[in-house]
Amino acid sequence: VFTVISVTVTLLTAYPMSRNDFMGKKFFNAIFVFTMFFGGGLMPTYLLMDQLGLVNTVWAILLPGALNVWNMILARSYYKTVPIELYEAASMDGSTEVQYFFKILIPVCKPIIAVLCLYQFVAMWNSYFDAMIYLDDQNLQPLQLVLRSILVQNQINPNLVTNMEKLAETAKLADLLKYSTIVISSVPLIV
């Protein structure tokens, strides 16, 4: 779900940024680049999510990352490689901006769409911090947060084990559990 939302928002945002005739293009580009370098901070972002009623909902994870500025810059750069003659021919045939975008530009841009989908899927798959901050409900926690808790909880305190052989055996089992958990959770990325 996140990949579809993010790629859709990214593609729709990148299109006007790629057009030379878009008024305010430099202003919006400056705002987007500014947000790449300077975030709002953890506490203000949490307070905003809380006031919007998004804490303990899936939307607290999906909405803040819906527009990835770096991916928008990639899509914008790819849009600029599409010949302007396609747009001119479509406009001469009576095509609107929306028709040109969905019927001509999107089919031509399938490679960048595939790249953006891959980037967003891997980014969401690897993120657990937002879920750790915004989701208290155990039923809403993603697999990454569950894996993190398994890996953190299986730490062995050597002061509690008196027999060194037992300590080594327990450490091997804990490591085996960690590694098998990581391998099993990586299957969707490989497939």
Residue ranges and their predicted role:
Residues 1-191:
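A hydrophobic, multi-pass inner-membrane permease signature
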